[in-house]
Design a protein with these regions (language model features):
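Local sequence-structure signature of Cys/Sec-based thiol-disulfide redox active-site neighborhoods
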Residues: 1-23
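C-terminal cap of thioredoxin/glutaredoxin-like
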Residues: 15-28, 55, 108-207
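Structural alpha/beta surface segment adjacent to cysteine/selenocysteine redox centers
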Residues: 17-114, 203
Length: 207
């Protein structure tokens, strides 16, 4: 039986892009059902980050670029300022997942932002990314206008924050346990193998 692994991401988080190789290796070597879950790091009215301020260049120099070189995934600090909100991109993720294209769509969004320096808060950019993986422009436009999808996204955000307890991304949830940050493939596979065999209710009773 497949083990469900939920991965919580935000499309403006570079570490969520850099963990793709780890996820690919996990899928190759373990029987897992990967579910991408949204978690916006900065909800309205919290301002999003600006690349011209001190924080982003510093964290990229100290952490992002070294990790990029380590995992072999090219990546650049986007110049979009302020950084886009990701609500609309996540609304279209719902559509992509309905077509079993969630991972492909997410990769396209990451690529647009971190390699092509595009504004992934812009409808046209989201549509282009979605169409590139097989969705139609019409259905993506409908998804962007859908109040039902907007409500679902709010529910997804609440699930991540209130039910699971997510505070940072990427985070992985396996059998009610969280692995936070960017684990190595070895560590994540070990966690899946151990946690998938446990009974969460029994573990909680033993805590």
């Amino acid at each position: 039986m497949s083990t469900t692994v939920e991965v919580f991401i935000d499309y403006v988080c570079p570490f969520c892009f850099l963990v793709e190789g780890t996820i690919d290796e996990l899928k190759r070597e373990c029987d897992v059902n990967l579910v991408i879950r949204p978690f916006e790091l900065r909800l309205k009215p919290i301002p999003t980050l600006r690349p011209e301020d001190d924080y982003l260049p510093r964290i990229w120099k100290d952490s992002v670029y070294p990790m990029s070189h380590q995992v072999g995934i090219p990546i650049s600090l986007p110049s979009v300022s302020p950084q886009p909100r990701t609500q609309k991109a996540f609304m279209v993720l719902q559509l992509a997942q309905e077509h079993d294209l969630g991972e492909e769509y997410s990769h396209a969004i990451f690529k647009a932002f971190f390699r092509e320096d595009q504004n992934i808060g812009d409808d046209a950019v989201i549509i282009d990314a979605a169409v590139s993986v097989g969705l139609t422009a019409h259905e993506v436009q409908q998804a962007l206008l859908s109040e039902a999808r907007r409500i679902q996204h709010a529910a997804d955000q609440s699930y991540a924050a209130q039910v699971v307890g997510i505070t940072s991304v990427p985070s992985f949830r396996v059998n009610d346990y969280l692995v936070v940050g960017v684990p190595s493939a070895t560590r994540l596979k070990k966690a899946v193998n151990i946690l998938s065999s446990r009974n969460p209710a029994q573990e909680k009773r033993n805590d």
